[in-house]
């Protein structure tokens, strides 16, 4: 059994280079006044690739060696984000010999670069969408799977392994138009209809008890949702996996998978892993590299998050209860208070990747729009991320293969921190024949998107323009992205 330490949260941050390699168009920016690191350098890192806020607010952690020799096991999990780590953990807990392969570092992609908000639902499918599309029993089962069960599972893992994820409870959806309160009310009613009642609608004045901003017309207070340190969660899942005898290889990119008569052969740069029973593709927007082009159901897009320097005013003067918030704009703002009087703030979704300067200007403008009382605003961290979306808004969950099952999940639309963990457990349970939860997810139909990746830089701006025109014509209609 590999002995590794639990992830440890710091009281604030340590400015340092990232231990993850810079991949593709993703980037991290650090305020230049902090970009003076100790003379002690970390192999494979650079001051041009600083750690983002999440990595900086955790103590240095274990790194795993890359795979150098052929090996075999029962199940290979490809991807060390939340989905892959949860799947691996729950397989190992049930005695399944599992190896996890990560092309970079654990939590280096979307799982360690998101907004850290815990909200119910399956990507852009919320309770009303489920109630409209499915039978009552199926909708109820799916809603609880993606809400109460997903949130409880995170708490159960935290308690079982004695892990601190900086978990906090309560969430707010803030309406930017009075008409959006109708949609929020219908959503809350659908949740009650499906047997879950943790929400209440508030008007403009009561909402100001929670958000000290005149920008909103009301909102939905959700006591089920909340916030978390996503990289601490990701590392905690890996800690549990290793405690149960699991094996992790980092900097081990999978080039191809091939099913043969005696197993599935997973080809990496330096070695082959033979999965005797199953393979799990937990690589989200990169799934296309290992799936056929004919089965492309997602379009990738880029997201952006920043963390301020410690503010001059107390964050409780902005968010008295400390609840995370996202709003009902088409291009949502999302934000929450974090350690040392900082505000973490994210927004936008683009088909081409913005650079640091454009992102910095945009997010500073959005913060001043929502909270004009903030003076002398300064950013310490800004970074980009990559995710993907499906046409119908739900996550694409697949199980295929001939003799040996291959699982794949992608299309998160920028939502789903808690749900990735729950779906990881569903994959493990499906593999051992313990439940049909994954079968429920795989029954959701998805539309193929021909040349989706190639057309993303054109399709996403076009869609945003069309929805923008629609919002001007009918500002009370709520469509968020």
Regions found by a protein language model. Name each.
Residues 1-75:
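Extreme N-terminal leader/targeting segments of oxidoreductases
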Residues 3-6, 354-355, 360-472:
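C-terminal catalytic lobe of FAD-dependent flavoproteins
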Residues 3-10, 16, 132-240:
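Rossmann-like flavin
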Residues 73-100:
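N-terminal Rossmann-like FAD-binding beta1-loop-alpha1 element of flavoenzymes
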Residues 93-113:
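Glycine-rich FAD pyrophosphate-binding loop
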Residues 113-145:
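Glycine-rich active-site loop/strand segments that organize a redox cofactor
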Residues 118, 162-166, 254-256, 272-313, ...:
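Active-site substrate-recognition segment that forms the wall
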Residues 189-190, 215-277:
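Helical element adjacent to the flavin cofactor pocket in flavoenzyme catalytic cores
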């Amino acid at each position: 059994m590999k002995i590794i330490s639990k992830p440890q949260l710091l009281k604030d941050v340590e400015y340092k280079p990232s231990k993850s390699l810079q991949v593709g168009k993703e980037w991290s920016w650090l305020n230049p006044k902090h970009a003076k690191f100790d003379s002690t350098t970390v192999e494979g890192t650079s001051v041009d690739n600083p750690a983002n806020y999440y990595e900086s607010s955790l103590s240095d952690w274990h790194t795993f060696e890359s795979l150098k020799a052929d090996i075999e096991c029962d199940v290979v999990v490809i991807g060390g984000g939340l989905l892959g780590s949860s799947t691996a953990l729950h397989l190992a807990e049930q005695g399944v010999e599992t190896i996890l392969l990560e092309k970079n570092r654990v939590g280096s992609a979307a799982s360690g670069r998101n907004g850290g908000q815990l909200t119910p639902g399956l990507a852009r499918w919320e309770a009303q969408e489920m109630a409209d599309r499915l039978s009552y029993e199926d909708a109820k089962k799916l809603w609880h799977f993606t809400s109460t069960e997903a949130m409880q599972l995170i708490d159960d893992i935290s308690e079982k392994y004695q892990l601190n994820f900086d978990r906090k409870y309560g969430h707010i959806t803030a309406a930017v138009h009075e008409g959006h309160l109708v949609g929020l009310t219908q959503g809350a009613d659908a949740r009650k209809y499906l047997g879950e009642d943790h929400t209440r609608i508030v008007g403009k004045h009561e909402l100001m008890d929670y958000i000290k901003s005149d920008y909103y017309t009301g909102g939905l207070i959700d006591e089920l949702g909340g916030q978390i340190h996503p990289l601490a969660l990701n590392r905690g899942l890996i800690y549990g996996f290793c405690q149960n005898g699991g094996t992790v290889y980092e900097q081990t990119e999978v080039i191809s998978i091939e099913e043969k008569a005696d197993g599935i052969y997973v080809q990496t740069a330096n070695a082959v892993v033979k999965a005797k029973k199953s393979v799990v593709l937990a690589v989200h927007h990169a799934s296309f590299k290992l799936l056929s082009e004919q089965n492309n159901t997602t379009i990738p897009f880029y997201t952006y998050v920043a963390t301020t320097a410690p503010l001059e005013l107390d964050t409780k003067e902005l968010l008295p209860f400390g609840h995370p918030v996202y709003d009902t704009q088409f291009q949502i703002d999302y934000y929450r208070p974090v350690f040392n009087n900082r505000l973490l703030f994210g927004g936008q979704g683009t088909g081409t990747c913005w650079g640091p300067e454009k992102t910095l200007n945009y997010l500073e403008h959005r913060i001043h729009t929502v909270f004009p009382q903030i003076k002398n605003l300064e950013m310490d961290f800004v970074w980009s991320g990559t995710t993907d979306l499906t046409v119908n808004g739900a996550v694409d969950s697949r199980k295929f293969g001939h003799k040996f099952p291959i699982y794949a999940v992608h299309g998160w639309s920028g939502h789903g921190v808690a749900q990735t963990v729950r779906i990881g457990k569903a994959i493990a349970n499906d593999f051992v024949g313990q439940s049909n939860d994954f079968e429920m997810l795989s029954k959701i139909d998805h539309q193929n998107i021909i040349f989706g990746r190639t057309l993303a830089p054109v399709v996403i701006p076009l869609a945003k323009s069309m929805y923008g025109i629609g919002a001007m014509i009918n500002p009370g209609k709520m469509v968020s992205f």
